[in-house]
Amino acid sequence: MEYHCQKGLNQGSRRSRRRLKYTLILSSGSPRDSMMQTNESSLLSKVGMTWLHQSVMLNLQSPDWKALSEPSKQLSMDLIRVLPSWVLEWDNLRQDLQSYALITTISLREWILQNVTLDH
């Protein structure tokens, strides 16, 4: 099965807006499939935010939360704010590494095919 890389702008985090994002598309896949793959990061971010919001709201009402000191509460709130962006950054990094691995594999395969042809 052949793979292709499609270049597109990433609408994710600040770091990834500065560079192009490569979305992997199976040659048998449709453009709709590739669009869904591109939107995985935003979906992951929304799901993460919803999950965090629900668990935070429960924790804010617990007796343990009320017993925390102000600095501990502030640290907890700061972590809650940055966690979704960390999840998104890790997902972007995973996608970048996956793209790089695929491109490297294709390049290596092409190099081997060229050199095998030259040797024989």
Curated annotation (Swiss-Prot):
It holds the Pfam family Sigma_1s. GO terms for biological process: symbiont-mediated arrest of host cell cycle during G2/M transition. It comes from the Viruses. Keywords: Host G2/M cell cycle arrest by virus, Host-virus interaction, Modulation of host cell cycle by virus. Belongs to the orthoreovirus sigma-1s protein family. This is Protein sigma-1-small. It comes from Reovirus type 3 (strain Dearing) (T3D). The lineage of its organism: Viruses, Riboviria, Orthornavirae, Duplornaviricota, Resentoviricetes. The gene is S1.
